[in-house]
């Protein structure tokens, strides 16, 4: 106010702020080239990025799950102006935008601690409702490390936003709906001690303990995660080889090509990527060869898949075909998509 008074009196002129020019910012410090080995996991993350699919990584401590997850934004398409406006509104309500950053210029990457409350995850609070981690991840990535360590009620708050792309926070004073279309990336150990299936045989957990640990993630929640990928320990031979791995830039080029295919396919439908495909669009948008159809039919019966799991496999297969530049989903595309449902397979053991 004092500055305004001096300006009106002519004692001190307020200089205009330079206009904000929107451009995307991409941190250069995190690159997939830094990660030795784990080619199968990188492939799964590339598929997830290409179709905006949710992914769960399962592996022992030190296998690189967190390292890989933190590099996922480096292969995602640039944030568009429209997406930035949507996400910036959420951050503005949360009071997380500063004077020198009136808009987000990079995709959000949120990684809440496993002690976060249901309110912290979904939003709410006393008085004015505030967006939670779910909405702060809109148009970006929500990374949940050590997934079974999160409280069950916190994990379950994700179920509806994963389906609807929005979350409604209801309080006595009223309700508020925030957007929440994000990529969910989860990481977990295979058991409580972390070493089930490890070549060293270090696991000390009983079969019942392992089952109880995995039951912390409900079946309906697992159904909503498109890809389940095992992350093995990296052997010494790969660690000592300091030859740079494939860069994020190269992977991002393939992701962008696949996203461009999806953009043209879904133009005017309100759908932007394969993960958002609606049930009524599946038949026309996911044509299968006869061999692929028979494979999917056999997998449905053999794995005891739910209808939701079947649809998610089909969406992942659609993305794999897009990465290959092919219109029809082949047997190879379907087989690769099926192998990313490892927890469905293990449920039969």
Please tell me what each predicted stretch does:
Residues 129, 151-349:
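Basic, amphipathic alpha-helical bundle interface domains used for macromolecular binding and assembly
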Residues 3-4, 67, 71, 187:
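Terminal amphipathic helices with adjacent charged low-complexity linkers/tails
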Residues 30-43, 52-54, 89-155, 160, ...:
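Switch/coupling sub-region of P-loop NTPases
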Residues 57-99, 164:
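Walker A/P-loop
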Residues 83-117, 124-128, 232, 272-281, ...:
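Conserved inter-motif catalytic segment of the P-loop NTP-binding fold
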Residues 1-55, 63, 170, 309-310, ...:
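Peripheral, non-AAA+ core regions of ATP-driven protein-machinery
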Residues 6-18, 80-81, 93-99, 193-196, ...:
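Proline-centered turn/helix-capping motifs that create local helix->coil transitions or kinks
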């Amino acid at each position: 106010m004092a500055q305004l008074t001096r300006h009106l009196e002519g004692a001190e002129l307020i200089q205009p702020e330079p206009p904000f020019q929107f451009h995307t910012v991409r941190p250069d410090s995190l690159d997939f080239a830094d990660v030795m080995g784990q080619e199968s996991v990188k492939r799964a993350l590339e598929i997830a990025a290409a179709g905006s699919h949710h992914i769960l990584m399962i592996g022992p401590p030190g296998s690189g799950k967190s390292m890989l997850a933190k590099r996922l934004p480096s292969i995602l398409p640039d944030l568009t102006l429209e997406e930035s406006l949507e996400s910036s509104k959420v951050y503005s309500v949360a009071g997380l935008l500063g004077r020198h950053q009136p808009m987000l210029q990079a995709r959000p990457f949120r990684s809440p601690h496993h002690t976060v409350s249901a309110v912290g995850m979904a939003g709410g609070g006393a008085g004015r409702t505030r967006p939670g981690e779910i909405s702060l991840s809109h148009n970006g990535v929500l990374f949940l490390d050590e997934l079974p360590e999160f409280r069950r009620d916190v994990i379950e708050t994700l179920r509806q936003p994963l389906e609807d792309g929005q979350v409604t926070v209801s309080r006595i004073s009223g309700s508020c709906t925030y957007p929440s279309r994000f990529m969910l990336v989860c990481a977990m150990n295979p058991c409580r001690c972390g070493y089930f299936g490890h070549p060293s045989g270090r696991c000390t957990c009983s079969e019942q303990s392992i089952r109880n640990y995995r039951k912390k993630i409900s079946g309906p929640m697992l159904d909503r995660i498109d890809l389940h990928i095992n992350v093995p320990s990296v052997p010494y031979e790969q660690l000592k080889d300091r030859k740079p791995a494939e860069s994020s830039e190269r992977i991002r080029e393939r992701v962008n090509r696949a996203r461009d295919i999806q953009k043209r396919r879904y133009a005017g439908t309100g759908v932007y990527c394969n993960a958002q495909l609606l049930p009524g669009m599946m038949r026309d948008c996911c044509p299968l060869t006869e061999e692929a159809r028979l494979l999917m039919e056999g997998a449905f019966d053999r794995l005891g898949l739910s209808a939701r799991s079947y649809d998610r496999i089909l969406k992942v297969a659609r993305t794999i075909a897009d990465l290959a530049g092919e219109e029809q989903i082949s047997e190879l595309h379907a087989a690769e998509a099926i192998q990313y449902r490892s927890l469905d397979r293990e449920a039969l053991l």
